[in-house]
Amino acid sequence: MRNRKPWLVLLLVAVAGLLLFVWRLGMTGLVDETPPLFAASAKAMAETGDWLTPRVNGLPRYDKPPLVYWLMGLGYALPAQDLWNPFGTWASRLPSALSSIGLMLLMALTLLRRPQGQPDGAQQAVTAMAAALAFALSPLVLLWSRISVSDALFSGLLSAALLLFWWRYARLCRWWIPWLVLGLAVLAKGPVAVVLAGLTALLFAVLQRDLPGLWALWRPWRGLALTAAVALPWYVLELLVEGQPYWDSFFGYHNLQRFTGVVNNHLQPWWFFFPVLVVASLPFTPLLLAGLVGALRPQPAPPEQSLQRFAACWLLAVFVFFTAAATKLPSYWIPATPAAGLLIALAAQNLRPGWRSAVLRGSTLALVGVLTAGLAAGNLWVPLINEPEMPTLSAALLASGALRRASLCFGVGGVAALLLWWGPSSARRGWLLVQQLGMGAFVVTALVPMVELGDRLRQLPIRRMASLALEQQRPQEPLAMVGILKPSLHYYTQQVVVYEGVQPNGPLNLNDRLAKEQRRGQQPSPASPGTSVLVVIDGNTATLPHWRGVPHQRLGTIGLYELWRVPRPALSQWSKDLAERAGLAPDWQEPRPERY
């Protein structure tokens, strides 16, 4: 029996997505360290008209293909930025938010067009909404859908392509549509999209014992040609323009080396994604595991009833591939979260009276109870938080009341779900959805305010320091940042910033780079009498011996950060003295896989 009002279900899903991902989206600044690099690259595209190569802080940025930069850049190209986009975050975050909302709608539509099992109309609506919300309420999705990076866009496009592959198997779309979307996924993050799609398809074909049928339906050779036609033109143009540096960085470092070696010290044990799977689906992890086990039964499923099995293969493909990779990050699990949402909702729909259902519901609500109690007891564990960049975080978080509101939302949702569970059979179908509504209220009333609190404590000092630097800056005076490196300083000052870390030869590097380094927006200049450099430095770095002795004038202090004016001749002399005393030398020209 088909739901007679699918548009109403989709409308409710869209409203939920807007509340979860768009509500107050642009009311906070960029979050260091990665999002400002994306935002600055996209803004540079819009301002310079160079839509081929992303560039940040005067250097090419080769780590991701251009689609996310193009979409962000379209936002930055709109007029009246100061009115609607004061922090630069509406334009840079909307692609992530809209990608997740679009995926929620596609998941719900899939379950409305091809209901799994024999649910009545009301159960179809509940399952469709529950699947979309189980995906959207994953902690990983809530976080990455509201920041300026490419993960949510990539996950949305890859997941849409995978769902459309299943649509083709269920005779719901033409063969070429999923391949077209897969090409966009390749433009969002690279060839890993094809690898994950291929691994999912292979696992599904093996479990369904229908490789010839799937091959005929999906037409992989023609499909891969279409995917290549969508994605390859940009890659070819980029290679022609940028040459070997692009090949070495994107394909060599950011793709091959991330799989075969550890990048950026992201070394994790082989079992890393087991706890990630558990945490990413809380508090519905018992339902996810039940849905996964139920999907792997040996007998093949009819094509139109095989969505649960397809979702299981999808989740396992992500798990196997990234477990095999040497570099592991929690964000690598995001492409599996839509599959987890489908498995959770279908497992809840398939619950029947008996001890097994009681255990699954009971364990899920027990996890809700644990989360409720943990949030209510925040005064016991929040003071243990030690964040050097936000020393007042613990006190501010407790004073905000956000944890009490969070506990209330989880608790009310859990009690409502328990009452429905004990109620008449017609009401039991809504127990999962009611709990999800409580979690949605948590996002709006507690999580978003906590994010805004973190912005005031961590990012506002950087924005204020950027304003101070612009006020104090003399004509042609360069700007540097040492110690804690914040790319948002580059974004908010809209100029090249020379970044140096805490290493002892930092002053030597800074002096040498000002005299020799050339990049877009920065020309080398001699340390002539009367020249100076503005330096943003954090308080801890300022106490280190190799920086403490640098002659400077302190122009202001904001939070952890100080603004110095350093005479260039004095910096040059200090660097020479430091080199002689400690035997140090500049090393900024040595090859580095990532630089900004």
Where are these regions (language model features)?
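Membrane-integral, polyisoprenol-dependent glycosyltransferases
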Residues: 1-357, 557-564, 572-578
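Membrane-embedded architecture of ER/inner-membrane glycosylation machinery
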Residues: 2-3, 7, 176, 294-596
